[in-house]
Amino acid sequence: MKANRIWCFFAWRMVVRASFLKEMDSIFVSAIRQNVQHTHSALLAKLKEPPDPDDENSWLCRISKKYDACGSREYSDKGLKGTYCPEDFCCSKTACFYGSCGSWCHDNWALCSSSIIYHDEYSYGKCNCKRFQENCDVNAICVHANREDGGAYCQCKEGYWGDGKSCKIDFCQLQPCGAGTCTRTDEGYKCDCPETHKLIVVEDKETCKAKPDFCAEEPCGPPSMVENCVNTDDSYECVCKQGYEVRNGRCEEIDLCADKPCGPDEGVHECVTERQPKLRYRCTCKAGFDLTTLPDGVSQKCLKNFCYEEPCGTRDLVESCKSKAYGYSCLCAAGAMVQVINGKEKCIKADLCRNDPCGPETAVIQCYSHGTSYRCLCKAGYTEVFVNGKSSCQKGDPCTLNMCGGNEAVQECTTDGTAYGCTCKPGYSIAIKHGQKFCNPEEECASHCGSAAAVKSCEILDSGGYQCTCNPGYVMRYSDYVKGCVEGNQCSLNPCGEQEAVQRCIPEGDTYDCECNPGFVKRVLPDGNFICADPASCVGNPCGSSDAVDACIAGTSTYTCRCKDGYTPQSIGSKLQCLPESTDQTDFDSKHKPEDNKGRYSKGTIALVVVGCVALLGIIAGGISYARNRGGERDDEDLAPPPRSTRERRLSSMGEGFENASWASSVSMIPSAPAPPPSGGIWS
């Protein structure tokens, strides 16, 4: 029995427990459902609530929360005028509560009782559209704010804008600006257009119109010239790359040469505009014009070279010619002077005898020009003497005038009245200056010409240099180690050229001849000597003299000639030369053909020169042979006679007839002046 009671107790307990749990679950689920429903209702209510108006002035009336403003009432810290609702009892915007007592609120202020205070105008649900919507604009509606602190406000109808109490037409609703931005104004609206559009006014109304794409068809030109094309309101603008400029609405090449910056066409061969690495122009000038850099250091111009045609005169008279902007000036060589002829300068041979530098008529037969200086022909009893480089006729014979030098140098001086000879003391040797010999310190000539045994003559030149003539068996050699006359002949110096080109060198007295290997030709060098050269080379100036030749250009199989104005390349046999344009081939061949079958020129030439009414006779090159081609061989490279040898060039017009004077040891005889010819004429 007792066990049954215990079992019943536990059974009952379990039933009660189950019932309690079931009831609790029911309560919990119900609470959750209520909470969800409440939340859902709140969300729906919130979604249905209209938003607050944009403008505070849109409100007609409003339910206040605590501490919110009560209409137009003012607040005083003395508590006389209530403005804020300190507790939760306010039910309208103008409901006022202050203190523990209250009464109806009036326009000003009132004492308060314990009752809730309402403003009669808005209290008890009177804040609604039914009562106040007449305060809205005719183009507005009244809207209830369905929320805890709700109220009523005005809202402009669609197509209008404002605070609801005053509504204006909303022109922006019609999107009058198109792609632009429309902004409402009191007067209407305004448009702000994007860069792709422009603002236009049509019938006093603004709108945005799309700009045409003027650049679509590449009006500025190809991309290689154009940096950018920019559309404007009514057109386009071109931005060109370096080296190009806008012309006629397109990018065109900048032609820096269009304005002829190089100068007039007469002097410009070519003007080229260069665009890389930077924009510039380049000039090449015609013959007779010089490319000149202007003072800005950048610009160039072809300026006329007024010296190109050698207006100052022949080269022997001219030291230099300086071309200027509008003319030239001449600097004449020694023995020449500037003379203005028809307003232009020219160097003419100076009349150095004009002031009778040789002396009085009692002493002088004649004063005559001699190179860039003058010489004196003296009467009997007078001798030509040089003092400080100037010649004059001094009374006395050569020996009494110490022509050989001072006693310290001269062993003996002998004279026959017209010629004199010098015997020098040891340590001195014969030297020549101004055509007159004297005893000079031996080491002076030895240091320039070589030993006394090797040197035939040592001539001191006006320039300060030395001209040496070697004895037979000696040749002149200049090198880093040897200078002067050394033992050997002309061929010992290998003058004919490289070994592969030379078959043999043939010595001929003080000169030589060359025989060349097959494939090489013999040419004449500017100094009159020969050399074996490659026929395609320019060795030996095969094109001719510098007066005619602008350039010789070597090739692989032949050479070519570029000639100066007035000359043209012409073939003479197998040789190409620059010759005057009027040169006849037959005349040229006959003028340059050797007189005998061995290629030798005449051995002696007699020159008759007439000065005023006096005939002057002189032997110019007696006994000198121009033998240059042995065995009768003809060489087309050898058409003109070479210049005179060193010995020939050394002879002056005063001494040529007396070169046979003795030069044995240190004794020599030389005339102080040439004897008058049998015809009674005089020497010049």
Curated annotation (Swiss-Prot):
Residues of this chain annotated as glycosylated in UniProt: 660
Domain (EGF-like): residue spans on this chain: 168-203, 211-252, 441-480
Any Pfam family hit: hEGF
Keywords on record: Cytoplasmic vesicle, Disulfide bond, EGF-like domain, Glycoprotein, Membrane, Repeat, Secreted, Signal, Transmembrane, Transmembrane helix
Disulphide bonds in the chain: 172-182, 177-191, 215-229, 220-238, 240-251, 445-458, 449-468
Signal sequence extent: 1-18
Main localization, broad class: cytoplasm
GO molecular function: calcium ion binding
Localisation: Cytoplasmic vesicle, Secretory vesicle, Microneme; Secreted; Membrane
Any Gene Ontology CC annotation: membrane
Topology versus the membrane: Single-pass membrane protein
Record field: transmembrane: 604-624
Gene disruption: observed consequences: Conditional knockdown results in decreased invasion competency of parasites. Decreased capability of parasites to form moving junction and secrete their rhoptries, measured as a decreased formation of evacuoles, vesicles that are formed in the host cell when parasites are treated with cytochalasin D (CD) which causes an invasion arrest. No significant effects on intracellular parasite replication. No significant effects on parasite egress from the host cells. No significant effects on parasite attachment to the host cell. No significant effects on microneme secretion.
Coiled coil: none
Xref: InterPro entries: ECM_structural_protein (IPR050751), EGF-like_Ca-bd_dom (IPR001881), EGF-like_CS (IPR013032), EGF-like_dom (IPR000742), EGF-type_Asp/Asn_hydroxyl_site (IPR000152)
Note: Probably interacts with MIC3 adhesin during the transit through the secretory pathway; however, the observed interaction is not essential for the targeting of MIC3 to the micronemes.
Complexes and interactors: Monomer.
Function per UniProt: Invasion factor; required for the formation of a moving junction with the host cell.
Annotated protein name in UniProt: Micronemal protein 8
Gene source species: Toxoplasma gondii
